[in-house]
Amino acid sequence: MSVWNYAVTAQKPTCVTHSCVGNFTSPQELNLIVAKSTRIEIHLLSPQGLQTILDVPLYGRIATMELFRPHGEAQDFLFVATERYKFCVLQWDYESSELITRAMGDVSDRIGRPTDNGQIGIIDPDCRVIGLHLYDGLFKVIPFDNKGQLKEAFNIRLEELQVLDIKFLYGCTKPTIAVLYQDNKDARHVKTYEVSLKDKNFVEGPWSQNNLDNGADLLIPVPSPLCGVLIIGEETIVYCSANAFKAIPIRPSITKAYGRVDLDGSRYLLGDHAGLIHLLVITHEKEKVTGLKIELLGETSIASSISYLDNAVVFVGSSYGDSQLIKLNLQPDAKGSYVEILEKYVNLGPIVDFCVVDLERQGQGQVVTCSGAYKDGSLRIVRNGIGINEQASVELQGIKGMWSLKSSIDEAFDTFLVVSFISETRILAMNIEDELEETEIEGFLSEVQTLFCHDAVYNQLVQVTSNSVRLVSSTTRELRNKWDAPAGFSVNVATANASQVLLATGGGHLVYLEIGDGTLTEVKHVLLEYEVSCLDINPIGDNPNYSQLAAVGMWTDISVRIFVLPDLTLITKEELGGEIIPRSVLLCAFEGISYLLCALGDGHLLNFQLDTSCGKLRDRKKVSLGTRPITLRTFSSKSATHVFAASDRPAVIYSNNKKLLYSNVNLKEVSHMCPFNSAAFPDSLAIAREGELTIGTIDDIQKLHIRTIPIGEHARRICHQEQTRTFAISCLRNEPSAEESESHFVRLLDAQSFEFLSSYPLDAFECGCSILSCSFTDDKNVYYCVGTAYVLPEENEPTKGRILVFIVEEGRLQLITEKETKGAVYSLNAFNGKLLASINQKIQLYKWMLRDDGTRELQSECGHHGHILALYVQTRGDFIAVGDLMKSISLLIYKHEEGAIEERARDYNANWMTAVEILNDDIYLGTDNCFNIFTVKKNNEGATDEERARMEVVGEYHIGEFVNRFRHGSLVMKLPDSDIGQIPTVIFGTVSGMIGVIASLPQEQYAFLEKLQTSLRKVIKGVGGLSHEQWRSFNNEKRTAEAKGYLDGDLIESFLDLSRGKMEEISKGMDVQVEELCKRVEELTRLH
């Protein structure tokens, strides 16, 4: 790997941090807006459920997000503030379907200590001011003028230093806040203040409330006419206003999120730390509050946000489990729950650990993550590409084409599968035992190759061979009519739909036939100047049986042409350029947009948007799918149309948000595909590969596939052991007792079924910190080693831990030996046939010794002190890289002769590390708790020992995510014949559920892409006017520095989503053809 790195997202963040509901895209439309770490999603509530309208990245981590409606506006605006003290106000532009920035700014202060409890951003209900609490002791006010424009911000001193929550109150003549705070004796109180815009200070508010519940943590302002505020504690809920005080006791719980149900604010949904959802009701007579009632409704994921949509439908956003769309029913179900889950939205976060494995042994990595937390904990298997789940297969050599046919046009299922070979055609059908067996269609020719087949109107079938077109009854299977090719001419290529046939004979003759009831009529015959290479008349208009247009690919001038049917008038001719002929053309429609796809003989695919009224082609794009000729076929899955591109690297072409996407199919070399929806194998595909015909169902059409293994507890560490085909995890379970105690386990799982095979309970207060599969010198067994710590309530740092060594015997964990340690075993590594452990501040090497009685034990060989806490350790050969709690990366070396570990070099910057990895002998990768990644290099050329002992920082970049783990590996099949296959990659997993890839590029490719990134920065403007350069700059509490040694793959790959005009603008600036740019960026997308 190198110092020239490319960082890109393989899976976008999935943790929901904020959500809100309002009329954002139009005054009549109800929208749900969801924040996921660094992304904003806008959904529309439709009768079919939630419909995604937009999903955009934000150049910042979202700290607060609120909808509000300024005076005189018909729809809501969105206020967003980021953790790096930038804010923006966004508005939806209905005409262009884009976000526009109404206001933006920087609200950072030179002085001031950032708040411990996170940022607070609130908007006065009467839209007079925005309030921000970003630093201890300060409240920042941004006033609105009477036109809804923002005026200059100012700070007001806030006496309360330990602020827990601040909210604006309803129904106040001047903007008024309620502040929930903790004093220096740990008691909690609420105070109210009026904001005086004239004097720019606080005026004592209408009321205050002292000595609340010790767990009071959340304020909910109640709208007019009731007004006042709800104070949510762990054991009580209080309603408070200038003239009322009501309190009710509750079952001990920590409320994590709330959502208002009614506009008048008399009912609220509360979600707690255990995933229970309650309804809180304020009882009142007119405007007088008479009391509070609370009722348990049921269980959801542990909520981070709750948004009530409409008609008892609620969105529950979660950071610890899958987010959910739920319905609240009036009557409870059999289990007494009022909650019905309508939809789940996958969340991988927080990814605490993961491993990369090749379970299917296909040469393709899959990531198995420890995801979620507490009761929502799970394992997730993430893989790239689309899988085919095989249902049946037969050995067949030399397949040249395949088509499925029905026994009558109204049948729901296909009956026949026609398989064509060089000198014969075979017909397969399902027998009573649901097996494929050979049958006959008497009217078909079976001793010649079939060029095309299709179901036809009037319960007929059509077969095209090199010398005839045959029309056959699908019920009697007898020939009803035929058309013969003129003497001396043979049919080279043909296509058909239910009522039309188009074919080309040698010499450039194009013949168009129409199908009637027992009739085949030659309607038109034209002579073209060159030979025809491919044809298509797939209907994309209103009539599913008839096409108005024909697409024709040509030899010699290498063009694709569009003709109008029935009279074969040429309306469009598009020269493709280059020397490779089109091998397959297809007219298709995705999400209401018509396209022409054109596949070339070298594995490239061109796509155009097609104007069906005039045949014009526009927005030409070229991608490389494989290296051999591609055949295109449509199929449908989950009632959407997709296209299968069969070649040496098969892919599925589909559309999402009106954008064409390409996803690899996890099969090697597919020559032909056709849909085969039979009664025994519904929604299946028939796939011809080298020497076999497979029938199987296809996965959901998306780029990454995520399988969930719910375990109902929190997995913290995971490890795979190939020899025993198992995984071992260390996990904790929260016991639902009054004391909220935890139990920790090591569990063994089957690598295929993910069933629990065996469990080993850890001691009281003992938790698993690290896990490893390894073998030792002079011992052929493979072991699982587990490092633990005893976390005692009275200790700041653990003073005791264990290393447990297990062997898997008959699917069970057997403890072979254990070794007590003087601290937490944060990390374990296999090291030259020995075991390397990091224990608190020490690195310790153990060898595997045979005792006299034949048992084995770990014996200490040597160690190295000099760390604050050695949390993360990676090894390569004799080198040991250590990521310290706060002293960045140091490099140690093991000296065999002396049997000692010495420090070789270190990075002298103060970085609080969260993960470390070795890229090669000289380059080391690290990440810190300020969401940066960086690379340091061993200084081999240094003239003095002092210079050589100092590592040089060669790369710095703000990834904007909290990274928990790096692992070498890839999510895609490494294909030996592609340049991309040679690029080394590291995968990382984050708290927000984002999975990223860091790829090391050759320097000349890096330089080219850096130029492209600079051009893209000018053309693609950040949402809310936020700067890309500032966002990606390295940033911690001490310093900010421009990014170096890293490129933003997400920005570079967004080039492919640009309009043709913008692509050309960039192409001019770089002096590189658009096609070449597309090809180079396309290739990068194959890294993930």
UniProtKB/Swiss-Prot annotation:
Family classification: Belongs to the DDB1 family.
GO terms (BP aspect): DNA repair; embryo development ending in seed dormancy; protein ubiquitination; red, far-red light phototransduction
Molecular function terms from GO: DNA binding
Pfam families in alphabetical order: Beta-prop_RSE1_1st, Beta-prop_RSE1_2nd, CPSF_A
InterPro entries attached to this UniProt entry: Beta-prop_RSE1/DDB1/CPSF1_1st, Cleavage/polyA-sp_fac_asu_C, RSE1/DDB1/CFT1/CPSF1, WD40/YVTN_repeat-like_dom_sf, WD40_repeat_dom_sf
Pathway as given in its UniProt record: Protein modification; protein ubiquitination
Superkingdom of the organism of origin: Eukaryota
UniProt-recorded name of the protein: DNA damage-binding protein 1b
